[in-house]
Structures are given as C-alpha cells and as structure tokens.
C-alpha cells in the first residue's frame, strides 16, 4: 500500500477534512444576513409589487432556495462539471417571474448569497499543526475541492484562515473556478499538473467516498478517507444496536434452552453469549456502503479507500 509507493504530494479536500461548519443556529443567522442583501439587490432592480410587498425574510429564503434548486438541476444535467452559476441564477430569477433578469443581476444576486468562510467554518484543532509537520517533512501539499464559490473573495477567505501558509492558491483546484467537479479525474489532474506531480506519487485525503475516494482511485492516487465525526458516531450507534440485539438474543436462547439443566454459576456464564466483533473501520465502511448503496450502485470501480483515518493528525503516523 504505502510502502510500495513513493508518495511526495498530499492533496486535501476542504469541507469536513480541514474545517467544519459552525453550529446550525449561527449558520442560519449568516444565511439570513446574506439573504437580506440579495433581497435589497433584487428590489433595487425591480419594483414588481409581488416582490416589494413580500416580507424580506420570506423573499430571501425564496431567492436562495430557487437558486440552489436551479444549481442542482444544472449539476444533474451535466455530471462531473459545474454549471455556469451566474446563468443558473438568471434562470432561477426568470422562473420566479423576473423576466428582465440579466447576467449583471444574476452575478450580483449570486454573490450576495455567498456565505464567507471565516464566519461560517472552523478549522479542526489539528489542521494547521498537521499541515506544518507535513510541509516540514518535505511533502508537496495541494487542494482539490468542490465549491460553488471561488474567485477573489475565496482567496481572501483562505488567507484569513491561515491555510495559504501551506498551499499555493494558484495551484489549487477549486471546482467553481475550474468548471469541473469531483470525482471527474480532470479536476485532480488540474491540481497535479500545476504541482508537477504524477498521480501515482500523490495521496488524496477527503470525507466523501464518491467524490474524493472514487476520483482518486480512478487515477491510481492513494486514497485516504476521513469520514465525518457525525458519520462515525452514527455507525457506532448502529454497531451498538446490533451488539445489544445479538447479545440479548443469545442470552434469551441460552436461558430458554439450558436454565433447567445448569446451576446458577453455569447459567450466568452461558448467558454472556459470544461477544460480537468490536467496532472497526471495516464495519464503518460496510455501514456506509450499505446505507448509501443505491447512490453508489452505478459506480463500477472498487470504492474501498486505501486508508481510513479519524483525525488529520493520524497522517503523521503514515507519512
């Protein structure tokens, strides 16, 4: 696996890999603020009474949902590629009845709906220290990320987080800017070409089996899965449920069949039953594959990651 390969470059996803999202209450507050900016932008363009008479909060939610729905539609039409987000916004506005919507308005509305990274994301505690250690050990570091927003504001946001101390922005592959999204191999090659690295010399770290692991495996990039903490917790609950069920069934069976033939000590020992295998990364992977089987069914390639880690700092025991 690792010992058979000369890895000199490590690529990272961003969301749920290097950072996590703020709590839901704060997210909704940030969303509301940007929604209201979008409403102001719209009302400065049109005096349509249907919109001007609508409560600002309601109109803001309507705008966001309409744009997000149109983006999802565009993504389904051309899998593996990002839609033209401005054009998509114009189409969403036109569907709402704003027939005069143009690219200028679409661009302004779409930008107004952006939620900035420093306010809405938090780096994991071990992110910067792990990146610093890997860089010190001589690894080339890169980013391959699916994002609806890129451009100058995203560059500024990454500067604020401190991540640009470890990544060269011009060598990142950001789907909103590149026009291609994971798992399309082209977005990985975009980053690798800029970093002057061959696929077999690279590793990819990410939280998504379909986007990160599948995309990496299509190019023979070493794939490292860092599942979300919430997913790991969900799988542990499922494992505990199966453990308790198996234990309870065994106890019931033992008691029913042998209670009349054993003394108290023998009965207590028999009631323990066989302890199921402990929670492992293999169980976690099997749980996710079973849960998401329908979504992953069309995939013809083996999606099993080469490595599974819980925390980013676990990479330091590997590289």
Description of each model-found segment:
Residues 1-10, 20-22, 45, 51-54, ...:
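Asp-based, Mg2+/Mn2+-dependent phosphohydrolase catalytic module
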Residues 2, 22-26, 30, 77-81, ...:
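Conserved aromatic-histidine-acidic binding/catalytic patches
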Residues 5, 78-90, 103-104, 111-142:
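Short, acidic loop-to-helix structural element flanking the phosphoryl-transfer center
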Residues 13:
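Conserved catalytic-loop position in the HRD/HxD motif
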Residues 16:
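Receiver (REC) domain active-site loop signature in two-component systems and cognate sites
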Residues 24-42:
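Basic, amphipathic juxtamembrane/active-site segments
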Residues 36, 86-91, 152, 186:
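A generic alpha-helix surface/boundary motif
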Residues 40, 50-111:
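A metal-dependent, Asp-based hydrolase signature
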